[in-house]
A protein has these predicted regions:
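A general structural motif
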Residues: 220-224, 313-325, 344-346, 381-386, ...
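Short, surface-exposed amphipathic charged segments that create phosphate/polyanion-binding patches used
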Residues: 150-154, 288-296, 416, 466-476
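A short, acidic, amphipathic alpha-helical segment used as a generic capping/interface helix at domain edges
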Residues: 349-352, 407-423
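A polyampholytic, Gly/Pro-enriched intrinsically disordered region
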Residues: 100-105, 293-307, 470-495
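His/Asp/Glu-rich metal-coordinating catalytic cores
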Residues: 1-55, 60, 64, 71-253, ...
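Hard-cation-handling environments
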Residues: 228-376, 388, 423, 438-440, ...
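Acidic/glycine-enriched edge-of-secondary-structure segments
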Residues: 30-31, 176-182, 187-188, 209-218, ...
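Short, compositionally biased "basic patch" segments
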Residues: 191-206, 293-301, 371-397
Length: 535
């Protein structure tokens, strides 16, 4: 009976842990690495078709995003997750597959022009559909016999709708051991979500450490009050408030806050001000939030629902799905609030909104989530005077603001508070899902408190029956900075190309009634361009 650490070891993304019980193999999470990769991960030591089941803590792509690849490689077992996680995966994995296909198509066209081989996507929509067919919904707090010798129970961990810590009872022969995987531990007092629920006991614990070396500000901001002030300021100036927000989770939290702002009349002089959600994925996710089991929400949200009030819907909310609906937003002169993805401004429709709004002094760009170093959002937060969008240099004249108190992860104190919920200290605590410094710092904190703890690197294996290491690995650093920058650059170029094509189509639609000579000339130029790049 062994546990082997594969991904999110001394890193924040790519969560994946392998369990071996009675010669059978199981995964906890199967996530995609995102952003810069610091340490090399060992490959799965067994083929995908040898994996009998996957246990999924939540739907975020860094925990679920390689499930379609696992299916592509031969996995045919079941994927256990809460019902809300299953519902979110249905949209998030398909969205991820579309991204993989689009990037592969763009790279293939580039490769073929250079006489090179076509680029295959990491996975496609068929692979994502195959993964979705394997989902097995579980209820919170219900013991499930997932396989011979495997019993699981999922406990709400308060990070995202449907997120769970997973308790596992593993039996091999006459020996039973219990291990708990924390998943991502949520912050307390977040909109919509319950606080992380405690787990009573375990022998072994795998715990995240995203913020294991730091504390959130003691004085957490009044999110609703600060957001209302930003809206008031922007609308009073005749400007827009643009909020880059992650499609799933953060967008819905912002809608919850704006609903309260409108209900309490905290913005004055701008009755029925419009709020646009401009992200197809966010629109789908909002639908899932609206349809989920009310028991998944916190007490405050359930009380609102009992009053017949929709907690994330209000007068003036407008959803933009098509590209035409998105474009109309920036042609409408009425002051407004715009929520769009991606949250770090690296891709998606938010880049169009930044292009149209950054240069205007009356506008506000409000960041409500973490901005990774080097991202466009990070550059704006850190005082960039000009940024390049779609091949143009855009002056940053808009006010840049940050909304505090919105983190979805527990800080060091929050992690320790959740850990204190165990009646007795676990025999061993494994620290993962944090960058190198955070992982090491949180592990050191635990040791100073009397815990037996380790922060394993990828490939480290531990025998749960004997309580001893069977394989010990050191972290192997790899130079992926250049490759990461190249990937980000390629994605930005692709986004710029799509935007240019949309602008060309918009131009064509304005030329009805122009002279035949001019229209024929433009048509010829477009056809020539197409023929040139088809080669």
């Amino acid at each position: 009976m062994k546990v082997q650490f594969i991904g999110a070891t001394h890193e924040v993304t790519g969560s994946c842990t392998l369990l071996e019980v009675s010669g059978r193999y199981y995964l906890v999470d199967c996530g995609m690495e995102q952003g810069e990769d610091i340490f090399q991960n060992v490959p799965l030591p067994v083929p995908a078709n040898a994996i009998e089941a996957v246990f999924l803590t939540h739907a975020h792509i860094d925990h679920s995003g390689m499930l379609p690849k696992l299916c592509k490689d031969g996995f045919r077992g079941q994927i256990y997750a809460t019902e809300a996680t299953c519902n979110l995966c249905r949209i998030m994995l398909m969205d991820s597959a579309h991204i993989q296909e689009s990037e592969a198509q763009w790279r293939t066209r580039k490769a073929e022009r250079a006489g090179e081989r076509a680029v295959e996507p990491v996975y496609d929509t068929n692979d994502a559909a195959a993964a979705l067919r394997l989902l097995r919904p579980c209820q919170y707090n219900a013991a499930v016999q997932a396989a011979e010798g495997i019993i699981i129970r999922m406990t709400d961990i308060g990070h995202l709708l449907g997120s769970a810590a997973i308790e596992m009872w593993l039996t091999e022969g006459k020996q039973t051991r219990k291990i708990v995987f924390s998943g991502d531990v949520g912050n307390v007092n977040q909109p919509l979500l319950r606080n992380p629920q405690p787990v009573a006991e375990t022998e072994y614990l795998v715990i995240e450490s995203t913020y294991g070396d730091r504390l959130h500000p003691k004085e957490r901001g009044d999110v609703v009050g600060e957001l209302a002030a930003c809206i008031q300021r922007a609308l009073d100036r005749g400007g827009n408030l643009v909020i880059p927000a992650f499609s799933v989770g953060r967008t819905q939290e912002m809608l919850y806050a704006i609903r309260e702002i409108k209900q309490r009349g905290l913005v004055t002089g701008h009755d029925h001000f419009p709020v646009y959600v401009d992200s197809p994925l966010a629109v789908e996710a909002t639908g899932i939030f609206l349809q989920c089991d009310p028991a998944d929400f916190d007490d405050e949200t359930r009380a609102i629902l009992k009053q017949g009030v929709n907690p994330i819907w209000f007068d003036g909310l407008k959803l933009a799905v098509s590209s035409d609906e998105s474009k109309i937003i920036n042609t409408d002169p009425q002051p407004k609030v715009i929520l769009s993805a991606s949250g770090m401004c690296e891709a998606g429709r938010i880049r169009h909104h930044l292009k149209h709004n950054l240069w205007r002094r009356e506008n506000i760009i409000l960041f409500v989530g973490y901005q990774a170093e080097g991202s466009l959002g990070w550059k704006l937060e850190n005082g960039a005077k000009s940024v390049k969008l779609f091949g143009e240099d855009i002056a940053v004249n808009a006010e840049i603001a940050m909304l505090h108190g919105t983190s979805g992860h527990a800080d060091k104190e929050g992690l320790l508070a959740w850990l204190a919920g165990f009646r007795e200290k676990p025999k061993m605590v494994f620290v993962n899902h944090g960058d190198d410094s955070s992982c090491k710092a949180f592990c050191a904190t635990l040791k100073s408190m009397g815990y037996r703890a380790d922060a394993p690197y990828s490939g480290t294996e531990y025998d749960l029956i004997t309580g001893k290491l069977t394989t010990y690995t050191e972290g192997v650093k790899i130079d992926r900075a250049a490759a990461f920058k190249g990937t980000q650059r390629a994605r930005q170029i692709y986004e710029d190309m799509v935007a240019a094509a949309e602008a060309l189509l918009a131009l064509v639609k304005t030329r009805r009634g122009n002279t035949n000579k001019d229209n024929a000339k433009l048509t010829g130029q477009i056809v020539s361009l197409i023929e040139k790049w088809k080669k």
